[in-house]
Amino acid sequence: MKIPFKVDLTGKTAIVTGGSGTLCSAMAYGLAVSGAKVAIIGRNKDKLNNVTDELINNAKTEYSKDIVVKGYSCNVIDKEELNKSYEIIKSELGSCDILINGAGGNQPGAITSIEMLKKEKEDSDYSFWNLDEDRIRDVMDLNYMGT
């Protein structure tokens, strides 16, 4: 994918959480082809490896340039794990200049299938009253505490 703008980020280090997902991998690519060294943080090592390989190959094909993109497996809601990952990133790529907190998601059990509560749907299995408190907490931890 060609980036429709030019920005010189040479010498900058960017960290992108949730970077193996569709949106954040595109952001990571834009940063990398603009010259930044990019650390992608995600939970799934295989997915990270696939995304980093794809971004590196795309940059060679589309821009005839080498980019620096590295994947780091980490759960952003585990502060100790996150701090360890950051120390590794700092030693390999340098201190963070650009941070994109893109990790996030949702889970069944934390959402309803009904947009508005109506009396006749009050007892539905997927209403507000049947939400799973633990799933809601997991989603909040990821989407709020993880950023």
Please place each PLM-identified region on the residue numbering.
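Flexible N-terminal pre-Rossmann segment of NAD(P)-dependent oxidoreductases
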Residues: 1-15, 129
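Conserved glycine-rich Rossmann-like NAD(P)H-binding loop of the short-chain dehydrogenase/reductase
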Residues: 36-51
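The beta1-alpha1 cofactor-binding region of Rossmann-like NAD(H)/NADP(H)-dependent oxidoreductases
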Residues: 45-46, 72-85, 133
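Rossmann-fold cofactor-recognition segment
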Residues: 58-80
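Substrate-binding pocket helix/loop in short-chain dehydrogenase/reductase
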Residues: 110-128, 132-137
